[in-house]
């Protein structure tokens, strides 16, 4: 090994090893600079605009009128009282609006795809394109919120669910457009391509609050935070068990607080993303960064995931004081492949309690993909104070590339009561273990007889 390179590695590793304690001051700095939205005093009750919470009447016109009135008054609060409000089509936000669902209120969207046309600019699995409108869509807005104790139902378990088996052509076309740098204005899919819309998408927005609502039955991802910043998501709950029902997907997102959320999802609870392949790498100036996840209850496929669409990079993620309240396949899961490029770095996870999982902690550069030549850089990942009752497959997995190893991984105070496989580490360097127990703890050696 080149001596100067060895010295650099030694200094780099020593620096990380000395500073891998959970950086609470950095967390506080992120949380303190996130701005909550502020709204004018204007309020409008949708009942005054002809809405009926009878589960039958189409209330699309009344909700559109409410948004228009808020825009005319430079913002305000739209009040949705108790009742079931059917809406045949999307809600499109304007700036400075709080959509407040009172206790007992439910918005129930139609499941007719043509209700979500004309197409809007959106993103689908990391590729920008035109597609069906998300059910709730905010584009280039500021100071916006969805609050209250009501429910949003995406009616995703019927027509939208059937799209999953038909999406192959549209999915491959979107990826080809990404890889071939087709201008976004020419990426028009929508009707006939079977790409399901997100339930809620904030796109190029800032100063966002989602608080205390319940999300059910999404067609696709539930809450997509796309190219947005200064975001607070707290106190919400889920029961959304359809295909690809991720709970929260920050993508190219900055300064995000996710706290006190109770998940029950058909896919990842939180999946941090940053664009896919060529398009993501071209946006490397806007990685997903400064994301705090704390005091959450996990249930679904995976607890916290980074990737696999993360080509612009993900950095400065802080996860603490979370636990499972039901099944998870994997607890913490970092995944990428040789298509992606980009980086995953400065990830700190502490005080996590898991029950039974398939894999407890999993870092892989070998997630399935279509190409090669763009290995991701995974470094500076710290896990501390993690407990798990049972891992039916593996306790800890670390998988890098032969020519770009995963590096600087700290595992401290890890207690996995039972695991079929304890630790599997391939193409990794500078892995520090301190107080790591998998299975029964060894005792002092017995004397020879």
Model-derived regions: residue spans:
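Extracellular/periplasmic carbohydrate-active domains that bind, remodel
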Residues: 18-449
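Bacterial Sec-dependent N-terminal signal peptides
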Residues: 1-21
